[in-house]
Amino acid sequence: MADLAPHQQVVRSHGPAAGKIGGINHLVLFVGDLEEAVTFYRDVLGLEIVRTQPRFSTNALSLQGKALMSSGDLGNEALVDHSVRQVFFKLGNGELFSVYEVDGVEPEPDASVVSFLWPDGSSKPAERPAKLDHLSFDVASRDEIVWFRDHLRSEGVVCSDLVERRGSDDSHRFLTSIYFSDPSDNPLEIATFDWGDPGWEGYDFDAWFRDPEPVPTLLVPRT
């Protein structure tokens, strides 16, 4: 290890929890109009609705009788109190994605920290990073990315062209993506690793560790 460059010394997995988290359980976005969101995510992006929540109040009193708190305590009882509706969508790999419509709150998310990737006109300008930077959906191949780009544009959605993260000689390969926003200006991405591409055969994944000056914790796990 001592003879390797710092970016080649990254400790990739460590500790008793290694490998126990199998994927994303769910993500939640705020939306300004639930009907618009359902139309967009179900009818345009093709996600399956698997759960709907009736309007509920986001306070400790309303939670009692609806959820079991193992500690017996309800924290942050006075922190928030809004009227919320929620819809859950299922992705093709079984992971869940959800949207909140919140009464009395203008959910104008600020920009992604990589907002230059989104095309002009796809979302409102902003001054600080969003709480959830962006949501990226996975598809199986580059052909599906092309299909979604054309499909979204046919639906009137402002969508970027393909962003291909690979060197001109395929020396570094990563994602192929498109960028767009939902009707509530939440920044979205559809991406693929395109694992069926023959270019992955024999690929050296050490190339994914690119930071020449990794933060110290990446190199030395907690003892």
Briefly describe each language-model feature range.
Residues M1-A17, G23-G32, V87-G92, V113-T223:
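Vicinal oxygen chelate
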Residues F30-P107:
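Core segments of cupin and vicinal oxygen chelate
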Residues G92-G94, V102-G104, A140-R142, P183, ...:
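Beta-hairpin (beta-strand-turn-beta-strand) motif
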Residues E108-V114, G199-G202:
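A short, polar/proline- and glycine-enriched secondary-structure boundary/capping micro-motif
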